[in-house]
Amino acid sequence: MRPFQLLSALAIFINLEAVEAAAYWDCDGTEIPERNVRAAVVLAFNYRKESFHGYPATFIIGSTFSGVGEVRQFPVEDSDANWQGGAVKYYILTNKRGSYLEVFSSVGSGNKCTFVEG
């Protein structure tokens, strides 16, 4: 391969990497970026219980979730910003490790959101 061909191949590879779609949660057609959800997981356990506009809320775990540990609820936004109070359109339920993680919509019928890999 000649040097100019190698440079072209590298440029194409870099552009393909940039175009790769990121993972997200589909909430009735609204996309919640995975990075927002992961940030909300961290925030849910960085704040003391109910210390930030009444969040994070903590739930008692029954035998259904054995091994999951404490589960917290925390709002998540569909934009690039973290939730700063006000109406809650979307929220997560998670444990500290993030091994149990669900996203829900409180808009409309309040459905569970679906994870879509990027």
From Swiss-Prot:
- Gene that codes for this? CSEP0064
Q: What does this protein do?
A: Secreted effector that increases susceptibility to infection in both monocotyledonous and dicotyledonous plants. Non-catalytic homolog of fungal RNases that binds host RNA and inhibits the degradation of host ribosomal RNA induced by ribosome-inactivating proteins (RIPs), preventing host cell death, an inviable interaction and demise of the fungus.
Q: Is DNA-binding tagged as a keyword?
A: no
Tell me if Disulfide bond is a UniProt keyword of this record: yes
Q: Which residues form the signal peptide?
A: 1-21
- Name the keywords, alphabetized: Disulfide bond, Secreted, Signal, Virulence
Protein name in the entry: Secreted effector CSEP0064
Q: Where is it localised?
A: Secreted; Host cell
Relate the assembly described in the record: Interacts in planta with the pathogenesis-related protein PR10.
Which cysteine pairs are covalently linked by disulfides here?
C27-C113
What GO cellular component term, any one, is given? host cell
Origin organism of this chain?
Blumeria graminis f. sp. hordei (strain DH14) (Barley powdery mildew)
